[in-house]
Design a protein with these regions (language model features):
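C-terminal globular interaction/adhesion domains in large, modular proteins
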Residues: 91-100, 105-115, 140-141, 145-381, ...
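Beta-strand/loop motifs with alternating small/hydrophobic and polar/acidic residues, enriched
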Residues: 2-197, 520-522
Length: 522
């Protein structure tokens, strides 16, 4: 009996030890779980605070898209009805503790950007986003065209007025393909940047598009040749034309309507209103100097208000804006023989220039940020480049002409290239152009593109936007070959005030998390 009792005692002790061990394990597990819960909660709140900040950005963007003057409002100048996000914390709809946001906005008008700083808050955890918002516009593209048709004023059509009337239609609207000359991307063409056309992309062969391609053409055409496929481009030879879209077939996006005039930029030269831009009358020669100055000759600009804008090594305008207007009707302007007072055209050149036209003759090396707009044409007469290039460069040039942006190419009546002693290469060989260019009424074009011997390759670092397609050469060996590359900085930065002429919805172009600002509401 005593042995049996001893065995029972040992069993009891063993059971008690197991219970103790299990209890200790349960306590340890519970303690671990209790310690982990605050960490897990903090992680959730940390992520939720960033989402709340993003909700603030989305909220402001929505309001801005409904009212593009919304940037005028702030904590001290509130809208009606009031927006609590300016002065306090806006609750995100949903369960309790879904989060709150507070924001402020700054209008960086010279850069075409509205900068929104949005802070999200969840259970005391705060995180902040700074977002740049700007309109969709021509700066988003290496190549943007309204009509994929030869410019009626290119010199090809015998009756430019009739051509303008008949060719101011998109392909799907029934533009005459027998009368209007369609310009196609061909085998050997490589587009190294984003492209958009309001028209239908026209191809002949196998061009390569290395950037995203978009079109406002909403239809799709079917092909039932060796393989069945649909596409949103027009093949000159039908099914055998197969362009290479490296980022995928063209997407359909809304029509991007180009403004009809650049006069909004001219307002930045109004000295009576306190603006600091430079305004010139009639033909004006601008040479950009690598030290950050410019040399300007403008014979018909006589206003004392702009005396500091003319001469040798003058400073770039403080706000970075130059506007060249036609000579006002109240002012006299005369030619020197067949030339304007700048010596254009040179002797024997078949190109004509007006004595009263707001034409810019441009060359040089830019250090700084500058926008040059003209009431008539901008003529690039020699290399026009930045003093530094690359992602870190702050040099940026916008060229916006009401009519053409032209590359200077003088020829005589026999179609022979002419030399101009003012150009460092005499004849303008292998032009280098660093700029975002917009030809509102016409196109980016080489003068006399179908005359003279070929002069090498034209290199563009920036972007080209135009109403019609403008030729730079021909397959017969005239003009130039093309080497166009997109300046990726244009995705988030802008030459001064160029976006003033846009009339498209705002979008977020860039955002980053930043330190929480001081002075946040309690």
């Amino acid at each position: 009996m005593r042995n049996r009792n001893g065995q029972q005692g040992v069993a009891m002790i063993t059971v008690m030890m197991i219970v103790v061990v299990l209890s200790l394990l349960m306590v340890a597990s519970l303690n671990y779980a209790m310690q982990g819960e605050p960490s897990s909660r903090r992680d959730q709140d940390w992520n939720a605070a960033l989402a709340a900040a993003q909700a603030g950005v989305d909220d402001y963007l929505y309001r801005l898209q409904q009212d593009d003057e919304y940037v005028q409002y702030s904590a001290t100048s509130p809208p009606t009805p009031a927006n609590v996000a300016f002065t306090g914390w806006h609750n995100i709809p949903g369960p309790a503790n879904s989060g709150q946001f507070h924001y402020s906005a700054t209008d960086l008008a010279s850069q075409g950007i509205i900068q929104v700083t949005s802070t999200g808050r969840v259970r005391g955890v705060q995180r902040t986003i700074r977002a740049s918002m700007r309109r969709r516009g021509f700066l988003d593209y290496l190549y943007l065209t309204d009509y994929e048709s030869l410019d009626p004023q290119s010199g090809y059509y015998s009756d430019p007025t009739t051509a303008t009337s008949r060719c101011s239609e998109y392909w799907w609207q029934g533009r005459s393909t027998s009368y209007c000359v369609r310009i196609s991307f061909v085998t050997g063409d490589t587009i190294n940047g984003p492209l958009h056309t309001n028209d239908t992309i026209s191809v002949n062969g196998n061009p390569t598009f290395n950037g995203a391609a978009t079109t406002a053409y909403t239809g799709a055409m079917s092909c039932t040749a060796s393989s069945s496929f649909t596409w949103r481009w027009y093949g000159l030879s039908g099914c055998s034309d197969r362009p290479v879209f490296q980022t995928g077939d063209p997407e359909v996006v809304p029509l991007l309507t180009l403004p009809t005039t650049n006069t909004a930029i001219k307002t930045e030269t109004d000295r009576a209103a306190g603006k600091t831009g430079c305004l010139y009358n009639g033909p004006t020669r601008i040479v950009l100097n690598s030290g950050g100055t410019m040399t300007v000759t403008s014979p018909v600009t006589t206003s004392s208000a702009y005396a500091s804008c003319v001469g040798t090594n003058v400073a770039l305008p403080a706000n970075g804006v130059i506007y060249v207007q036609n000579v006002p009707s109240t002012q006299t302007a005369t030619c020197t023989g067949s030339q304007n007072r700048l010596g254009y055209p040179i002797s024997g050149d078949v190109t004509s220039y007006g004595c009263r036209d707001g034409d810019v003759f441009l060359s040089g090396t830019l250090r700084g940020r500058l926008t040059i707009a003209s009431e008539n044409n901008i003529v690039i007469v020699a290399n026009t480049t930045y003093s530094s290039t690359g992602a870190a460069s702050t040099d940026m040039l916008g060229l916006i002409a009401n009519q053409f942006v032209q590359v200077y190419h003088p020829v005589n009546s026999s179609g022979t290239n002419l030399s101009d002693s003012r150009n460092p290469t005499s004849t303008f060989t292998n032009p280098q152009i660093h700029a975002a260019m917009l030809a509102l009424g016409h196109s980016f074009i080489v003068q006399n593109y179908n005359e003279g011997a070929q002069l090498g390759t034209i290199t563009v670092n920036g972007g080209i936007a135009q109403k019609w397609r403008g030729p730079v050469g021909t397959s017969g060996g005239t003009g130039y070959l093309k080497n166009y590359g997109y300046d990726a900085r244009l995705q988030y930065a802008s030459p001064p005030y160029v976006m003033d002429i846009a009339d498209t919805p705002y979008r977020v172009s860039q955002w980053a998390e930043v330190q929480n600002p001081t002075g946040l509401p309690a």
